[in-house]
Amino acid sequence: MYQYLTYPRDGYDEGSLKKDLIYKLITIHNTESSHLKKLKSYYMGEHAILKHTRRNVNAPNYKTVANHAKDIADTATGYFMGNPIKYNNTADGDIDELLTAFDGAEIDQVDAQNALNMAIYGRAYEYIYAKEGLTELDSTSIDPENTFMVYDDSIERKPLFAVYYYEVKDDTKDTTKYQAEVFTENLHYHMVLRSTDSGTTQSEEATPHNLGQIPIIEYRNNHFAIGDYEQQISLIDAYNSLMGNRVNDKEQAVESILVLYGTQLADTPEDAKVAMKILSEEGLLELPG
């Protein structure tokens, strides 16, 4: 379920966003991020059935994964973006320069990734930025698990700023930094929230991004930002369980053993346990006459 993160417009000043505020919002978003990670794991074929165990460790335990989640998302994305979006000039304006910029940013690939993210997560985020050392604009799709938009508390829910948070590892020094990029309408904050080599920091650097609007765009799959297979996960789990149980039943039938009447496996309970273990593992037991 999509969670709106809000901030009072009356007290909002884009020039004075603090690390503590951003850290609190990230903590709130993390509760939803765990659900988004689950949606991604189902797309990747990491289903609940893979954690299934049986009381009898020697019994067949096939963990069949029918990845309908990926089938649904890929099919929906193919129908949606099988043909790239076309942009045409109109009588009101010439967009040739925009089309040239789109080609340079490989916008077709960005659109396709956004569509797939919407199918998986129910939402997608596109980041518009200037290439390093250049004035040319580029575009990329960023991970919904680490991105969110903050809205004002008005009836219109106007976006105030966007947050993209991530970790940076330095394997040469065995350190990790947890950073956030915060974008308002006019400013870009780079915040180092925490560093393993120096602890919590107060790094809050704000610079103009000169784009005139928040450079992160949020797209929703629908009003409630529900992914294409999100509400079918319980059915996918049930199907995986059913198929696994069927295979287990077949395997148990193949490995069935003979029931003995009128004789004993052993003279003592301890020897009987040993004999039953041999039967369960080998499916065969020799009884001398």
Model-derived features: positions:
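N-terminal start-of-domain structural block
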Residues: 1-37, 192-226, 230, 234, ...
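Extended, regular secondary-structure scaffolds
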Residues: 115, 125-224
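Extended, charged amphipathic alpha-helical segments
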Residues: 200-289
